[in-house]
Amino acid sequence: MRLPSRQQVLKMLATFSLALGLFAAKVQAHGGVIGYSWDGTWYEGWHPYNTPVGQTSIERPWATFDPIMDATASTVGCNNDGNPGPNQLTATVAAGTAITAYWNQVWPHPYGPMTTYLGKCPGSSCDGVNTNSLKWFKIDEAGLLSGTVGKGVWGSGKMIDQNNSWTTTIPSTVPSGAYMIRFETIALHSLPAQIYPECAQLTITGGGNRAPTSSELVSFPGGYSNSDPGLTVNLYTQEAMTDTTYIVPGPPLYGSGGNGGSPTTTPHTTTPITTSPPPTSTPGTIPQYGQCGGIGWTGGTGCVAPYQCKVINDYYSQCL
């Protein structure tokens, strides 16, 4: 029997790895932004699996933890149809303030970019405004931070390291007014790329006078296409193991003077936290993949045999 060539082996491995990524995408939980904080205040996000009756939030409603896998979908703006919630709130934030968004779980996808956009509403409030009608500009991005496309450190990996949170500073030059802020993570571990956007309603005060240029503005849908290089990259090819460049999808960063697809990244800091001791591995009733510990966790810590409670980060331990 003739042995396969090296090229054939590499191709088979790439195909197998991609298949594993596709399988993992189906069995792993996904999620979205479930809260925001700045200046010491917590703003509760939308809870997509709770009844909408009585929910009040600065975040626009969204219905599912599932990813958006069509970059031109009508929901790609804010993971919804663009409409506000029944009891929509607005939060006030000063230009120059750092806003932190928090995801619902230990994020399972460390390979992909993080982006943050602002979209200015036409009046004094975003109440009643459909977000699909807005023009958006990007104020933050972090793509491939170091290493290679196939084995490097990505913005989403840094988000995970920051306790599943991402902090973006509102530029001090942004004009005051009513805005939507859009936090987004894109997962590249399988194709099509998985897009996870959520939006919240703001009033920005104390701003500047630098409006975004026309080249910095995009619509959603419309800002991405399914053929964008930043959405079609294959992490499992031989080239990906040596390639050190990645083009973040979307327009150029606000104020950068670029032409879009910039690899520019923004430094981010992590808020110090108090760590909790590792949970015990006493046999119990928590099933595989269940939570068994973490800061603020008041449930059980014992996993069913043969699984053990493993620390994922300070806020989350899991039966594995």
From Swiss-Prot:
SUPFAM superfamilies linked to this entry: Cellulose-binding domain (SSF57180)
GO biological process, alphabetically ordered: cellulose catabolic process
Cofactor annotation remark: Binds 1 copper ion per subunit.
Endpoints of the signal sequence: 1-29
One of the record's GO molecular function terms: metal ion binding
Disulfide-linked positions: C78-C199, C121-C126
UniProt-annotated glycosylation sites, renumbered to this chain: N163
Protein's cellular compartments: Secreted
A cellular component annotation (GO) from this entry: extracellular region
Entry EC number(s): 1.14.99.56
Domain of life: Eukaryota
Cofactor(s) required for function per UniProt: Cu(2+)
Segments for region (Disordered): 255-284
Induction: Expression is induced in the presence of cellulose, but not fructose or malt.
Family the entry assigns: Belongs to the polysaccharide monooxygenase AA9 family.
Name of the protein: AA9 family lytic polysaccharide monooxygenase-like protein CEL1
